[in-house]
């Protein structure tokens, strides 16, 4: 069966760098991509206020998803951001300094910024910091209001990193609830965004909760406190399905969206999905990691890892690597493997790991070995 990924006819489709260097990659005209993005039209007070130009100042609080991590295929360090003249977000007690990402690399936030500025907003601060949790932000919440003591609108998307920062859902709700109460008192419109699913969990990191548990805790917290919220955990996969985009094609490494993923996320934020297609059951797909030392292009489908578990589990699995996988894939690939109970295995490869595109290659496990890669037509 031909595995094909539909491609959005969007100007945001561009060539992304595969390794970060000092020179920023040059995408297709960013202004055109942003100008074509949908406006925030959800049935929310903040959307109506934005449309009538009543929002002059906006603050975004979040982690790497709101920072725009890998939006341009790169992860920009704090020293690089400082050298580029990016805005200083805050300075931690230990002297660590955190800077905004470049404005055109801020993922879904850049689309919100464009709409707000077009409507007359004069202040837009993105205080998202990669790797940080709601628990961390709660401990540093006063530092978010050093430039000004309140904003017209505040958007918050946190929780993904609380899978490790917090031990239980109760602890997470307590920390996040305290942060949101503090923030809500300093704005006219507070909008909470339920974080998107992290479909790849590194095996070397212990998670006390999964993405679904985080999402349910955020919903509960917002429901009890009466906060407006957008359920990106549900709406992002649904929007992907409506647009004909497999969910795995919208991630870079399974945790952070790629450029088209961020565009799809913003579309899901801007307006509710129509629900015209069945959303992908990403929970049924096993993400087996990234750049594993024990997995190569010659690995047999029934090979075991050090714990005695199959490297390729039964069913569908996803694997990412930017190292050489086979001679036909010298720069790595995004791989989807279908392993059946009868031992038959088919593997599809997409050499462009950062953008939705066709699974252009296919191979099969036959007679104790992998066939050569062939065109998937």
What are these regions (language model features)?
Residues 21-27:
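Bacterial lipoprotein signal-peptidase II cleavage site
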Residues 67-74, 129, 133-173, 196-199:
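Oxyanion-hole/transition-state-stabilizing segment in secreted/luminal serine hydrolases
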Residues 198-281:
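Catalytic His-Asp segment of secreted/periplasmic serine-dependent ester chemistry enzymes
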Residues 57-67, 123-128, 152-158, 190-195, ...:
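Structural recognition of the beta-strand scaffold that forms the well-ordered cores
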Residues 155-161, 180-216:
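Active-site segments of SGNH/GDSL-like serine hydrolases
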Residues 281-361, 365-377:
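Glycine-rich, flexible loop motifs
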Residues 16-19:
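C-terminal motif of bacterial Sec signal peptides marking the signal peptidase cleavage site
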Residues 28-126, 143-148:
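Serine-esterase "nucleophile elbow" of acetyl-processing enzymes
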């Amino acid at each position: 069966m031909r595995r094909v990924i539909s491609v959005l006819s969007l100007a945001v489709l561009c060539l992304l760098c595969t390794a970060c260097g000092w020179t920023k990659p040059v995408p297709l005209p960013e202004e055109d991509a942003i100008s074509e993005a949908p406006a925030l039209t959800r049935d929310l007070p903040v959307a109506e206020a934005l449309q009538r130009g009543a929002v002059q100042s906006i603050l975004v609080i979040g982690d790497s998803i709101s920072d725009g991590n890998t939006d341009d295929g790169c992860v920009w360090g704090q020293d690089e951001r400082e050298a580029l003249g990016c805005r200083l977000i805050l300075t931690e007690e230990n002297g660590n300094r955190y800077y905004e990402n470049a404005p055109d690399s801020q993922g879904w936030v850049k689309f919100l910024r464009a709409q707000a500025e077009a409507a007359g907003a004069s202040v837009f601060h993105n205080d998202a910091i990669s790797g940080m949790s709601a628990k961390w932000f709660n401990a540093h919440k006063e530092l978010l209001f050093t430039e000004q003591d309140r904003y017209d609108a505040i958007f918050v998307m946190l929780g993904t990193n609380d899978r490790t920062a917090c031990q239980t859902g109760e602890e997470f709700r307590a920390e996040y609830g305290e942060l949101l109460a503090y923030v809500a008192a300093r704005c006219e419109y507070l909008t909470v965004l339920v974080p998107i699913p992290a479909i790849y969990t590194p095996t070397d990191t212990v998670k006390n909760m999964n993405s679904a548990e985080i999402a349910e805790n955020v919903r509960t917290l917002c429901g009890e406190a009466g906060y407006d919220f957008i359920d990106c955990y549900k709406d992002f996969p649904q929007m992907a399905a409506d647009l004909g985009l497999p969910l795995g094609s919208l991630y870079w490494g399974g945790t952070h969206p790629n450029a088209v993923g961020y565009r799809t996320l913003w579309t899901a934020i801007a307006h509710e999905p129509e629900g015209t297609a069945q959303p992908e059951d990403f929970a049924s797909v096993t993400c087996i990691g990234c750049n594993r030392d024990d997995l190569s292009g010659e690995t047999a489908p029934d090979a075991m890892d050090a714990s005695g578990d199959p490297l390729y589990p039964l069913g569908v699995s996803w694997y990412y690597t930017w190292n050489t996988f086979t001679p036909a894939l010298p720069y790595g690939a995004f791989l989807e493997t279908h392993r059946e109970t009868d031992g038959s295995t088919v593997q599809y490869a997409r050499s462009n790991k950062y953008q939705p595109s066709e699974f252009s290659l296919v191979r099969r496990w036959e007679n104790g070995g992998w066939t050569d890669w062939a065109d998937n037509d």
